[in-house]
Amino acid sequence: MPEAKPAAKKASKGKDAPKEAPAKQTPEEPPKEAPPEDQSPTAEEPTGIFLKKPDSVSVETGKDAVILAKVNGKELPGKPTIKWFKGKWQELGSKSGARFIFKESHDSTSNVYTVELHIGKVVLGDRGDYRLEIKAKDVCDSCSFNVDVEAPRQDSSGQSLESFKRSGDGKSEDAGELDFSGLLKKREVVEEEKKKKKDDDDLGIPPEIWELLKGAKKSEYEKIAFQYGITDLRGMLKRLKKAKVEVKKSAAFTKKLDPAYQVDRGNKIKLVVEISDPDLPLKWFKNGQEIKPSSKYVFENVGKKRILTINKCTLADDAAYEVAVQDEKCFTELFVKEPPVLIVTPLEDQQVFVGDRVEMSVEVSEEGAQVMWMKDGVEMTREDSYKARYRFKKDGKRHILIYSDVAQEDGGRYQVITNGGQCEAELIVEEKQLEVLQDIADLTVKAAEQAVFKCEVSDEKVTGKWYKNGVEVRPSKRITISHVGRFHKLVIDDVRPEDEGDYTFVPDGYALSLSAKLNFLEIKVEYVPKQEPPKIHLDCSGKTSDNSIVVVAGNKLRLDVAITGEPPPTATWLRGDEVFTATEGRTHIEQRPDCSSFVIESAERSDEGRYTIKVTNPVGEDVASIFLRVVDVPDPPEAVRVTSVGEDWAILVWEPPKYDGGQPVTGYLMERKKKGSQRWMKINFEVFTDTTYESTKMIEGVLYEMRVFAVNAIGVSQPSMNTKPFMPIAPTSAPQHLTVEDVTDTTTTLKWRPPDRIGAGGIDGYLVEYCLEGSEEWVPANKEPVERCGFTVKDLPTGARILFRVVGVNIAGRSEPATLLQPVTIREIVEQPKIRLPRHLRQTYIRKVGEALNLVIPFQGKPRPQVVWTKGGAPLDTSRVNVRTSDFDTVFFVRQAARSDSGEYELSVQIENMKDTATIRIRVVEKAGPAENVMVKEVWGTNALVEWQPPKDDGNSEITGYFVQKADKKTMEWFNVYEHNRHTSCTVSDLIVGNEYYFRIFSENICGLSDSPGVSKNTARILKTGITLKPLEYKEHDFRTAPKFLTPLMDRVVVAGYTAALNCAVRGHPKPKVVWMKNKMEIHEDPKFLITNYQGILTLNIRRPSPFDAGTYSCRAFNELGEALAECKLDVRVPQ
């Protein structure tokens, strides 16, 4: 298909033109849309968000094209989404092929985004209109440009530069003499061009201006003529009228491929071309490689059509296709569009520690789909993954982002975007906090016994050191330090008095220490008389006051009380007033001769109270009391609830716990999660002391749950009950463009537009309020919200000046009000009455009998005008005509029109002494009556003159013509003679001699032909003359011919299981006998084959062919004069 050349390119053929001057450097020819000299080009003016729009380009085939645009980031609320389109909707992306490269860059200093589209090795299929679309939240803008693809360019004179040669062997460009012999071979071409140039210059207009005029619109002729100084406008127009665009028609193709096709992935597509000769060989190519028939690519021949069917299109089929017939080719490009990829399982918020392994996964609807990961609005690519310690993984429909060793800077908001949806989640990375699961306890041991300090921390990998009175403890024969899992032990064998002191365990890398005291119980041997009263030696560490001990719930408590006396006393323990004697269980007593121990394996709140030990012997008794106080983590907070929500925040309120664990509550910790998720996210890391907290950074429209922990010196409580699910939503923005539509003496009609931002909460309606000027009290005009963007406020005081405002209402509450800038005076404005007569009623309005008459005529005027209809000065007949009048229009209605409804109707609209009138002319028509007095006036030869008179009833419409028919008296079959005959007479010719004819006439008007015709009262008799016929003698022609195939059999490739047909056409007389054969074996009465012969068109239908049916088929036709044979090959392919 020939391509149109730009005018600038033809202008370079002048005598003094440079040989390789590019088209854009031709100063005499600006483009068609070039602005006047006093204006700057529109492409350089910043329009909307574009600082520089993409320019239309013209590229030679096989070269690269670059399109550049710049976007003002100051006009955008965030990072823009950039899309390129070919045509109107065909989106270009990573699936468009490797030839399309998209680049984006951002200059942070000037806040300018630069976008580029690179098209490599341009082909003819790239020609067309393109569109660039920029979108950022609610801001969207687009602009279009064109890419024109040309054939490779020669030098400016139309000849190859190789025509100029230099004689000699010198390598220098100036060596030797110029040899112009190459030009002599194309002298005729040069002379033709000179002659053409002379013809173009006969008006003194350069050829490039003619090319510009040929491509311009007619409305731009005068502007171009004025711009280039052309004064002979009449001659210029005559010349343009004579100029004809020669379109070179294709010799091989009668219908070519479209420039581009688009198909969804998984579907099939048919590429159809039509060739001029069905016998021409045809080949299909994909990216330059010939396509062979297969189950994927199916070739079909239907007449002159050649069809390529591509089944189950994949992204590999996204390519350039061409079809070649002899030396001619046509091209197209196929774009395979992926279905929208939906997000099935979104990302979930995660809270991890530094060094942990993190996997953020999302599940999409399509396997192998492309997704884009973003962190804090910046795209994450595989190229950057080597520097940033992350990697991507695909597992079927799941896409996973993996951090093997997460760092604190990896925290942030992560987003996954597909072409059908997006989701986001937050990753919080915090420093590891070591949790003490079991603290070390104070010990009291005797000499030569073993002392064991044991603690448990949350991290198995944490190491630490033991200190005694600030000095590090080193292992020795008596001292053993061990670390097994989360447990750390310090074991001291054969305890000595110098081992007494404060022992501390300090984990490495944490500002944490665990301390306990080792008390050495020294046994002194003294001389005691044989009888000594019992004595209690009470010395327990951990007491806060005299005889008071504090223990943490869950820890072990052992009270070793030394007793003396002679004879050895008996010890009794009491809890409150009850004697405690258990020797086994969680709480029990251990008795030794010189010591009585009270042991609690795991302290509970119920163990708190006063404990008494009483020792007795015959000499006396001794009593000591100990108050045990058990401290614990507090109870969970109560009455946790969300009191209010916003666009991305919520207010959380709770009550302090009833039981504080024996220690004052120091603060609270909060957590939240999305409803349905199992992952809780910490909101605060430092304790929060108040009971009201504002949680932020939530996603509007997502359901959340929250819970609260209480914290005291002992630890963190159990979580509270979850709040009811809540959704962060915000009121809408203020309604827009509030205006006054109408004002009367007591009402005001307002209208507005919906808010710019509605949000996830939607909008339930609008509330209208008004306030008298000078007052600050706003009065609601409607109790229930109105859904439409308009409202009439009624019962207003006449003459008052009132301000109005409108607020949007949704589940989150009221929006900001939209208020009128000026107060409105409540007084109706008198407007002169005016009838707005529709255009079709300004002329006679014609309807047919029986049809409905429904006329709607709008008018204006305030207050409501008085409307009066009359016909000929008299009131209308209300039994036939219905009239309905509103504030803005009047309706004239007749259910079934009759001819009596025709006439002139007057409509008047009056307000006080002001009046406007209009006249409506109505004509009701029907079919006309038959023609009158149809007579045959004269007969001569085979002609007859018929005349008639117009019908008495014209159906209230002009007679537009007559319909004339004739009939032979013998058969009385009527035949048409004339249609739309305008006159009341006609001459009927070519009548048959010897016959007698009748004639009938139908009248015709706007409704059609009359129901009955007017029939001629007399007949036209065509008499015979005395001419005798002498037949000529001739030799009878011999019509017998031998069989000959007009259309031969064609080789076929069919798909197994689908019925196939072999067709050919044969001619012969007498009618030849036809025999079908397969592999030279005659096909008999086989139900698999159906043979038909319709007027020489022979068809062999093969029902559901299989590979066994493949072979050579032949058709043999023979009669007494000879025979003919046609053969073809049938190939049956099995779908893969």
Curated annotation (Swiss-Prot):
Residues 46-149, 250-339, 340-432, 433-533, 534-633, 833-927, 1043-1136 form the Ig-like C2-type domain. Residues 1-55, 151-177 are annotated as: Disordered. Residues 13-35, 163-174 have a biased composition (Basic and acidic residues). Residues 636-732, 734-829, 930-1025 form the Fibronectin type-III domain. Pfam families: fn3, I-set, THB. GO terms for molecular function: actin binding; structural constituent of cytoskeleton. Keywords: Actin-binding, Cell adhesion, Immunoglobulin domain, Muscle protein, Repeat, Thick filament. The keyword Repeat applies. InterPro entries: FN3_dom, FN3_sf, Ig-like_dom, Ig-like_dom_sf, Ig-like_fold, Ig_I-set, Ig_sub, Ig_sub2. The keyword Calcium does not apply. One of its GO terms (cellular component) is cytoskeleton. GO terms for biological process: cell adhesion; muscle contraction. Belongs to the immunoglobulin superfamily. MyBP family. Thick filament-associated protein located in the crossbridge region of vertebrate striated muscle a bands. In vitro it binds MHC, F-actin and native thin filaments, and modifies the activity of actin-activated myosin ATPase. It may modulate muscle contraction or may play a more structural role. This is Myosin-binding protein C, fast-type. It comes from Mus musculus. The gene is Mybpc2.
